[in-house]
C-alpha cells in the first residue's frame, strides 16, 4: 500500500475541500478578511468529462481510475470553446459541515488562494510552516518562506538576478543602489520612473482583501473584517538567554510562528504593486496585533500588462508528495481557441509551453490565417513549412549510420537474458557469449570506426570480442538506471571498442597549471565570509540596507541575467531553456589531443557573449591551437592553460567562428591560418581588462583564479563566488584531476561525491548547480559540469559533482576556478523576442519543480520506496525502458560480481528519491476551472525535460501502445524542431497525441 496513494486521498486533494469536502473544513485563515478558501473560480468542483480526463492530466492518472486520469478537460487539439469540457465547468458550491479534523491538516495542501473581488490580485492564506511561490505573469516573481518569514521579489523588468526583500523598507524592483532610510522606517516615493518600495504599517483594509469573486462571493465576504478589530501591538520576538548572539530586530510587525497562520494579499492598483502581510492565531483574540506590514512598489508602464497569476504550493504526507499549480487568468485577451491549446499544454505538466503550443498548431491542418500563429516567435512561424517537411521527408541516414543503429539494437537484445516474467533484465555472462554476438560485436566496432571522428580507433588498438563485451558490460552496469535511448547513445562512444580502454583519456586532458603566487597585500580571508561584519550590523541598524555586499560587482549590470526561472541563487540550469543562447552551444569533442584548456576557455568566453546578448556562436578552437607563437610540432601533446588563451587573442586581436575554421584534432599543430575576408571576428571591440586584485585570488591580466584549498575553512564562500560568476557570466573554468577518476563509463546523471587532488590535469566548465538528497537522506548541492569529451560521454557531455565532497577529503574535487575579466559591449540589437504565448503562460523550468520539492524535503519524514516497489510502479506506468534489472537489484552477494542484474556502481552517493510526486494543475478563468494531474515516479522524473508517459491515447486502451511508440522512436525525433509532430507522423493509425511529451 505504500506504493500507491489512496483513491480517497487523491479525491480529497483534487476537490480541494472547498466544493466536496472529504473530512470537513478548518476555519483557519478567515482573520482579516475573507475565508481561507478557494474562491473566484478556484473550487475544484465536479469535473466530470471524458474518461481520460484532462488533456493536461498525466497519462498515468490516479490510481484506481483509467490509465490516463480522471479530471476532465478537453481532448488534445480540441479548440472549440463551445465544448463544455474544453472550456471548463461552472463552479457550484456545496454546503458541507465546517468541522475540522487533525488529519485534514496533514494530508492536503494547506496553502489556499483566491482572487480578490474588486482588485486585480490574489489573497493567499495558510499555516506558518507552509511555503509557496507566486508569479505575476510575465514580470514578477514572489518567493514566500513562511517558516523564516522571508518574502523575496524578483522581476524581469530589469536585467538583474538580485532579489529584493519584503522586510527591507527600501530597495527597488529595477534600481540597484544603497538606500538610506528615514529613522521611522518609511521611505518616501522617489519618483515614478523607477520601481520604489514604500514601507508602511497599517490596519488591514477590508476592501482590498476581499477574496470573493463574481462566482462565489458569499463564501468569504462574511468574514472579511474579523482581524481589523484587534488593537494591541505585537512585540518583536526576543532572544533567549542562551542565544550566543543578539539577533537584530526584525523590520516586520508580523513574524510567523508555529501554530499561527498567515495571510498575504497581492494586488495591482494603477502602476503600483501592493503587498500586505499579516500573521494571526487560530482563534480570534481581541488582544492580537491588528497591524499589517505593507509594501508598495512603483512599476513602470509596460507594453505587456500582467495577464495571469500563477501560484505553486507543495505538501508532503506519508511519503506522498503533492505539487499544486494554479493559474488564474486575470487579464487575458488571448483568443479562446489559442488559450485552450495553451492551457492544455499547461495542464499536461509540460514545461515548454511554446514547443507544445507550436506542436498543437503543426498537427492541425495548415491554416495560414490562424490567429494563434501570432503567439509564436516569428522565426518559428516563418519555418512552419520547413518544419513540416522535416518530418515528412523519408530520407534515410547514410548506409553506415543505418547499419550502426541496427547493430546497436541487435547487441542490446543479445546481451540480456529473458527472465521468467519475459523481461530482459539480466546480463549474460562472458561464457554465454555465442558466435552470433561475437560477430555482431566486431561488425559494430568496424562500423563505429567508420563514423568516429575523435581519433580513438585510429590511435589505439581495437580489442577482440571479449574486450568489447567486457567494456560494454561495464558501461551498462555503471548506467543501469538509464533508459534505452540513452544507452543507445552511449554505445556510440568509440572507447568501448578499445583493447586497453583506460588508455582513452591519456590524451584527452591537457591542462598545465601556471606558476602564480598570491598577492598577500590583497589577501583577506574574511571578505567573502558570510558572517556580517560589525560595520554591516551598524549600518543596518541605522537604516542603510546593502542589497548584497558580496554579489554586487561593478560589472553585474552589464550582463543579461534576468532568467530567474532557470538560474538563481538556489539552482541554475540554463540548459533546460531551449531558447536560451547557452543551451544552443553544443557539447564538443577535443579528440585525441590535449586541448581541454582551449575548449574550457573558449566556452567560457562563448557564455560571456551569450550573457551580453549575442547569438550563440562557437569560437574556433583550431585557430587558438595553431596561432601559438611557440613550437607547433607537439602541440597536441603539450597542454597549456587559459592564460595562454587570453594571450593569443590579445596578440592577434581576432577570434574566428568555428564555422570559419572547423576543429579537427589531426590539424592541430599546423600554421596559424591567414584570416579570410568573410570570417567573422567574435572578438570585435573586445578588451582584456587588467587584474582586479580580488581577495583570496590569483590575479593576472584578464582573469581571476580562486583555489579551493584557500577556502578550506570557508567553502561556503568559495561556492558563493562560483554561483555569482555563473549567474553573471554563464560559466566558469574549473581545474580538476581526471586521471584515475574519470573514464569512458563515468556516469553523468548521478551526482558524484569525489575527493580532489593537490594538482590538476584537466580543464572543464561549471555551468550550473542544483540540489539533491544523498543516500543518507541529507540535503546536498551539486555543480553541473561541462566536459569536452563529446555528447556520448557522461550525461550528453555533462556530469554532476557534489559541491563539498566527502568530509574526509583533504582537497575539493574542484581544484581551482578561473574567471575571465573582459570587456565586451552589450548587444541589444539581435536579442530575439520570445514567443508572445509567454505573456500569458509562465516560461517554466523542470529545475523549478524539483527545487520546490527539495526546499520542502523533510529528512525526518522521508519515506523512500524499495526497488521492488519502484519496479512495480514502472510497470504500472507502462514505460518498458525505465530501468534494466530492477527486479533483482541488490541480490548479488557482497564482494562478488553479479551477472544477474545491472547494479548501480561508481562513487555516487545520490539516491533517486523514490517518493511519489503528484502534480495537480488548475487553470481558472471566468469563474470556471479546468484540471489536470501528472504523476512522477520519483524526484528525478520531475526534473526531466521530456517524458513519453505524457503521451495521450484517444482510446485509453491504447495508452501503453502510445507510450511504447514514443519510447521506441524518441531517438529518431528528439533532434527535430517539433518532436511531437515527428512522432505523430510515425503514428500511422492516428491513435496517439504526442505534443505533451
UniProtKB/Swiss-Prot annotation:
Instruction: Show the ranges annotated as biased composition (Polar residues).
Output: 68-84
Concerning CDD domains, the annotation shows:
Peptidase_C1
Q: Which residues carry this modification: Phosphothreonine?
A: 549
Indicate the annotated site residue(s) for Ancestral active site. 596
Matching InterPro entries: Papain-like_cys_pep_sf, Pept_asp_AS, Pept_his_AS, Peptidase_C1A, Peptidase_C1A_C
Active site, UniProt feature: 762, 787
Listed GO MF terms: cysteine-type peptidase activity; kinase binding; peptidase activity; serine-type peptidase activity
Kindly list every residue the record annotates as glycosylated: 184, 318, 828
**Which SUPFAM superfamilies does the entry mention?**
Cysteine proteinases
List cellular component terms (GO): extracellular space; lysosome; plasma membrane; symbiont-containing vacuolar space; symbiont-containing vacuole
Give me the stretches of Low complexity compositional bias.
Answer: 52-67, 85-103, 183-196, 205-235
Q: Where is this region: Disordered?
A: 26-107, 181-252
Locate the region Interaction with host VTN.
373-390
Disulfide-linked positions: 445-497, 567-572, 581-610, 593-636, 627-672, 755-809
* Swiss-Prot/TrEMBL GO biological process terms: exit from host cell; proteolysis; regulation of immune response
In terms of superkingdom, the source organism counts as: Eukaryota
Cited SMART domains: Pept_C1
Q: Tell me which Pfam families the record gives.
A: Peptidase_C1
Q: How does it assemble?
A: May interact (via C-terminus) with PTKL (via SAM domain).
- Tell me, what does this protein do in biology? Plays an essential role during the asexual blood stage development by controlling the kinetics of merozoite egress from host erythrocytes. Specifically, prevents premature rupture of the parasitophorous vacuole and host erythrocyte membranes.
The molecule here is called Serine-repeat antigen protein 5
Q: Which organism is it from?
A: Plasmodium falciparum (isolate 3D7)
Source species taxonomy: Eukaryota, Sar, Alveolata, Apicomplexa, Aconoidasida
Amino acid at each position: 500500500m505504500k506504493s500507491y496513494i489512496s483513491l480517497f486521498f487523491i479525491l480529497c486533494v483534487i476537490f480541494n475541500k472547498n466544493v466536496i469536502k472529504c473530512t470537513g473544513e478548518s476555519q483557519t485563515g478567515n482573520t482579516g478578511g475573507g475565508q481561507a478558501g478557494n474562491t473566484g473560480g478556484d473550487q475544484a468542483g465536479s469535473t466530470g468529462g471524458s474518461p481520460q480526463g484532462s488533456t493536461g492530466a498525466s497519462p498515468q492518472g490516479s490510481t484506481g481510475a483509467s490509465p490516463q486520469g480522471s479530471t476532465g478537460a478537453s481532448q488534445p487539439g480540441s479548440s472549440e470553446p463551445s465544448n463544455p469540457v474544453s472550456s471548463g465547468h461552472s463552479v457550484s458550491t456545496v454546503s458541507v459541515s465546517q468541522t475540522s479534523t487533525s488529519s485534514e491538516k496533514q494530508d492536503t495542501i494547506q496553502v489556499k488562494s483566491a482572487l480578490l473581488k474588486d482588485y486585480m490580485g490574489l489573497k493567499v492564506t495558510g499555516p506558518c510552516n507552509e511555503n509557496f511561490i507566486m508569479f505575476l505573469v510575465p514580470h514578477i516573481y514572489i518567493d514566500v518562506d513562511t517558516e523564516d518569514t522571508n518574502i523575496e521579489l524578483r522581476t524581469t523588468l530589469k536585467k538583474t538576478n538580485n532579489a529584493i526583500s519584503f522586510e527591507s523598507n527600501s530597495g527597488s524592483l529595477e534600481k540597484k543602489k544603497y538606500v538610506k532610510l528615514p529613522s521611522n522606517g518609511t521611505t518616501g516615493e522617489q519618483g515614478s520612473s523607477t520601481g520604489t518600495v514604500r514601507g508602511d504599517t497599517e490596519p488591514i483594509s477590508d476592501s482590498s482583501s476581499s477574496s470573493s469573486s463574481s462566482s462565489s462571493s458569499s463564501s468569504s465576504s462574511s468574514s472579511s473584517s474579523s482581524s481589523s478589530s484587534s488593537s494591541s501591538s505585537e512585540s518583536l520576538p526576543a532572544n533567549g538567554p542562551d542565544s550566543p548572539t543578539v539577533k537584530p530586530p526584525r523590520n516586520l510587525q508580523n513574524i510567523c510562528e508555529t501554530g499561527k497562520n498567515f495571510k498575504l494579499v497581492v494586488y495591482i492598483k494603477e502602476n503600483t504593486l501592493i503587498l500586505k502581510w499579516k500573521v494571526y492565531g487560530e482563534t480570534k483574540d481581541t488582544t492580537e496585533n491588528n497591524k499589517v506590514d505593507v509594501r508598495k512598489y512603483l512599476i513602470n508602464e509596460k507594453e505587456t500588462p500582467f495577464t495571469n497569476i500563477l501560484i505553486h504550493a507543495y505538501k508532503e504526507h506519508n511519503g506522498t508528495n503533492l505539487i499544486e499549480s494554479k493559474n488564474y487568468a486575470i487579464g487575458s485577451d488571448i483568443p479562446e481557441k489559442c488559450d485552450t491549446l495553451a492551457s492544455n499544454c499547461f495542464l499536461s505538466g509540460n514545461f515548454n509551453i511554446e514547443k507544445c503550443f507550436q506542436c498543437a498548431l503543426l498537427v492541425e491542418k495548415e491554416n495560414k490565417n490562424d490567429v494563434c500563429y501570432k503567439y509564436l516567435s516569428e522565426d518559428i512561424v516563418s519555418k512552419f513549412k520547413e518544419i513540416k517537411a522535416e518530418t515528412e521527408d523519408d530520407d534515410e541516414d547514410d548506409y553506415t549510420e543505418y547499419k550502426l543503429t541496427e547493430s546497436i539494437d541487435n547487441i542490446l537484445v543479445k546481451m540480456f537474458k529473458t527472465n521468467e516474467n519475459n523481461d530482459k533484465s539480466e546480463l549474460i555472462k562472458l561464457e554465454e557469449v555465442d558466435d552470433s554476438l561475437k560477430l555482431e560485436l566486431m561488425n559494430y566496432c568496424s562500423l563505429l570506426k567508420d563514423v568516429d571522428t575523435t581519433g580513438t580507433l585510429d590511435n589505439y588498438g581495437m580489442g577482440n570480442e571479449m574486450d568489447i563485451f567486457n567494456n560494454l558490460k561495464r558501461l551498462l552496469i555503471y548506467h543501469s538506471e538509464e533508459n534505452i535511448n540513452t544507452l543507445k547513445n552511449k554505445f556510440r562512444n568509440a572507447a568501448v571498442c578499445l583493447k586497453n580502454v583506460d588508455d582513452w583519456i591519456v590524451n584527452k586532458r591537457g591542462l598545465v597549471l601556471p606558476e602564480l603566487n598570491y598577492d598577500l597585500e590583497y589577501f583577506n580571508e574574511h571578505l567573502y565570509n558570510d558572517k556580517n561584519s560589525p560595520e554591516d550590523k551598524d549600518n543596518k541598524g541605522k537604516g542603510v540596507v546593502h542589497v548584497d555586499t558580496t554579489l554586487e560587482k561593478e560589472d553585474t549590470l552589464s550582463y543579461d541575467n534576468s532568467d530567474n526561472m532557470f538560474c538563481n541563487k538556489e539552482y541554475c540550469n540554463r540548459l533546460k531553456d531551449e531558447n536560451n543562447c547557452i543551451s544552443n552551444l553544443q557539447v564538443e569533442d577535443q579528440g585525441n589531443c590535449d586541448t581541454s584548456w582551449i575548449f574550457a576557455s573558449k566556452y567560457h568566453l562563448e557564455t560571456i557573449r551569450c550573457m551580453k546578448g549575442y547569438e550563440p556562436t562557437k569560437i574556433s578552437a583550431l585557430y587558438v591551437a595553431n596561432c601559438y607563437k611557440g613550437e607547433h610540432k607537439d602541440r597536441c601533446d603539450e597542454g597549456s592553460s587559459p592564460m595562454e588563451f587570453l594571450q593569443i587573442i590579445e596578440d592577434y586581436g581576432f577570434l574566428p567562428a568555428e564555422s570559419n575554421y572547423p576543429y579537427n584534432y589531426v590539424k592541430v599543430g599546423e600554421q596559424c591560418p591567414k584570416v579570410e575576408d568573410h570570417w567573422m571576428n567574435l572578438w570585435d571591440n573586445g578588451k582584456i581588462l587588467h587584474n582586479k586584485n580580488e581577495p583570496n585570488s590569483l590575479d593576472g591580466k584578464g582573469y581571476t583564479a580562486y583555489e579551493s584549498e584557500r577556502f578550506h575553512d570557508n567553502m561556503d564562500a568559495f561556492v558563493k563566488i562560483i554561483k555569482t560568476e555563473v549567474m553573471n557570466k554563464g560559466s566558469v573554468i574549473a581545474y580538476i584531476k581526471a586521471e584515475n577518476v574519470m573514464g569512458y563509463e563515468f556516469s553523468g546523471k548521478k551526482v558524484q561525491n569525489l575527493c580532489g587532488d593537490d594538482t590538476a590535469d584537466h580543464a572543464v566548465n561549471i555551468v550550473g548547480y542544483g540540489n539533491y538528497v544523498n543516500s543518507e537522506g541529507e540535503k546536498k548541492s551539486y555543480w553541473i559540469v561541462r566536459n569536452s569529451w563529446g555528447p556520448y560521454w557522461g550525461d550528453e557531455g555533462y556530469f554532476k559533482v557534489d559541491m563539498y565532497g566527502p568530509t574526509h577529503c583533504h582537497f575539493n574535487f574542484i581544484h581551482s576556478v578561473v574567471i575571465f575579466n573582459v570587456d565586451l559591449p552589450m548587444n541589444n540589437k539581435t536579442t530575439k523576442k520570445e514567443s508572445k504565448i509567454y505573456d500569458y503562460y509562465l516560461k517554466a523550468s523542470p529545475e523549478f519543480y524539483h527545487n520546490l520539492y527539495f526546499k520542502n524535503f523533510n529528512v525526518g519524514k522521508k519515506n523512500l520506496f524499495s526497488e521492488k516497489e519502484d519496479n512495480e510502479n514502472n510497470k504500472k506506468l507502462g514505460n518498458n525502458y525505465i530501468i534494466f534489472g530492477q527486479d533483482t537489484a541488490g541480490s548479488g552477494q557482497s564482494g562478488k560480481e553479479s551477472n544477474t542484474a545491472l547494479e548501480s556502481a561508481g562513487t555516487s552517493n545520490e539516491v533517486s528519491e523514490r517518493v511519489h510526486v503528484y502534480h495537480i494543475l488548475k487553470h481558472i478563468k471566468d469563474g470556471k476551472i479546468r484540471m489536470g494531474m501528472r504523476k512522477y515516479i520519483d524526484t528525478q522524473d520531475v526534473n526531466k525535460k521530456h517524458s513519453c508517459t505524457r503521451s495521450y491515447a484517444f482510446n485509453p486502451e491504447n495508452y501503453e501502445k502510445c507510450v511504447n511508440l514514443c519510447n521506441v522512436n524518441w531517438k529518431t525525433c528528439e533532434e527535430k524542431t517539433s518532436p511531437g509532430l515527428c512522432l505523430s507522423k510515425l503514428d500511422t493509425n492516428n491513435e496517439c497525441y504526442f505534443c505533451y511529451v
